[in-house]
């Protein structure tokens, strides 16, 4: 049986994507609902369909992990600064972090973590909540 090179190429390209998604799900699954609730000050439940999403609608947050992309954080931050005038540095989390719109992007342990925070009434409150979640998450990486 002969395997086409196109099929083999698709498998090779899909493997890193599936392993990146599996890594993100594994890290998010280590983050407990109790840790999340303590970090944000309200009880939140994990989505039954996405281990990286907690809460519902505008009382929620989600996590995206880009494994191994830490070296690209500078480019990521530069693009955010171009697109969002409210982009600001966030000290005290990871090796580098910025906040823009509703997102905290953190460079930690060679990865980039983005937390989209829909809790909090002001940018300062959203930053504090996202930072608290990020600290818990990074401890599980």
Identify the role of each PLM range.
Residues 8-18:
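Bacterial N-terminal signal peptides
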């Amino acid at each position: 049986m002969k395997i086409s090179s196109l099929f083999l190429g698709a498998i090779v390209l899909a493997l890193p994507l599936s392993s990146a998604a599996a890594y993100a799900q594994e890290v998010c699954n280590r983050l407990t609902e109790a840790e999340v609730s303590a970090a944000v000050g309200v009880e939140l439940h994990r989505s039954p369909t996405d281990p990286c999403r907690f809460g519902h609608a505008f009382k929620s947050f989600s996590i995206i992990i880009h494994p191994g992309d830490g070296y690209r954080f500078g480019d990521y931050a530069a693009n955010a600064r171009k697109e969002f005038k409210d982009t600001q540095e966030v000290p005290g989390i990871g090796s580098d972090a910025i906040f823009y719109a509703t997102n905290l992007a953190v460079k930690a342990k060679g990865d980039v973590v983005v937390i989209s925070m829909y809790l909090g009434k002001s940018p300062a409150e959203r930053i504090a909540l996202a930072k608290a979640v990020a600290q818990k998450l990074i401890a599980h990486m």
